Swiss-Prot record:
Main location: secreted
Role, per record: Granulocyte/macrophage colony-stimulating factors are cytokines that act in hematopoiesis by controlling the production, differentiation, and function of 2 related white cell populations of the blood, the granulocytes and the monocytes-macrophages. This CSF induces granulocytes.
Annotated compartments: Secreted
Protein name in UniProt: Granulocyte colony-stimulating factor
Keyword Secreted attributed: yes
Record GO terms (molecular function): cytokine activity; enzyme binding; granulocyte colony-stimulating factor receptor binding; growth factor activity
Name of the encoding gene: Csf3
GO BP term, example: positive regulation of myeloid cell differentiation
Alphabetical list of SUPFAM superfamilies matching this protein: 4-helical cytokines
A Pfam family hit: GCSF
Signal peptide residues on this chain, from the entry's feature table: 1-30
Length: 208
């Protein structure tokens, strides 16, 4: 049993790495995010905001990992190559954080992309409603944590005076027509979210 658990974890790590790389480099498939037309000079971000954001990232990543392990163990949806192809067929969107890369870090654009991306993944998690009665509490908590993180980012943008006058509208979400699609879509959406959050975590460290 220990060997099977270790193999399952290795497959899960491979899935997250592959999908993270796909999310980072598939710019053409990324959902359009809010752009900021006029970028004022960057102001130092409060340490309290950075610490709170990093803690929220850690909490979401931990819940996401638990949910991925449960989906992998229960439904055997653990083969990266199959899931990536399924993601294309289901139209699972991914958010880009091009403005948050260490090579081209732009504070205002990064915050805007962070907020838009979190709203996207919040919508995806909502679309997964009914994935499994046993997983519903964890999924609901994950969705709430993502929404709270998005609020934290938006409030900081308002404090800096760089928030758009109107919050971005949510993109159309994929329509899952079967329990299998919803569960497979859950694995993909949460894996994309994990990669997104890892980029966000690195960016927040740079902004600090």
């Amino acid at each position: 049993m220990a060997q099977l658990s270790a193999q399952r974890r290795m497959k899960l790590m491979a899935l997250q790495l592959l999908l993270w790389q796909s999310a980072l480099w598939s710019g053409r498939e990324a959902v359009p995010l809010v752009t900021v037309s006029a970028l004022p000079p960057s102001l130092p971000l409060p340490r309290s905001f950075l610490l709170k954001s990093l803690e929220q990232v850690r909490k979401i990543q931990a819940s996401g990992s638990v949910l991925l392990e449960q989906l992998c163990a229960t439904y055997k949806l653990c083969h990266p190559e199959e899931l990536v192809l399924l993601g294309h067929s289901l139209g699972i969107p991914k958010a880009s954080l091009s403005g948050c890369s260490s090579q081209a870090l732009q504070q205002t654009q990064c915050l805007s992309q962070l907020h838009s991306g979190l709203c996207l993944y919040q919508g995806l998690l909502q679309a997964l409603s009914g994935i499994s009665p046993a997983l519903a509490p964890t999924l609901d908590l994950l969705q709430l944590d993502v929404a709270n993180f998005a609020t934290t980012i938006w409030q900081q943008m308002e404090n800096l005076g760089v928030a758009p006058t109107v919050q971005p509208t949510q993109s159309a979400m994929p329509a899952f027509t079967s329990a299998f699609q919803r569960r497979a879509g859950g694995v993909l959406a949460i894996s994309y979210l994990q990669g997104f959050l890892e980029t966000a975590r690195l960016a927040l460290h740079h902004l600090a």
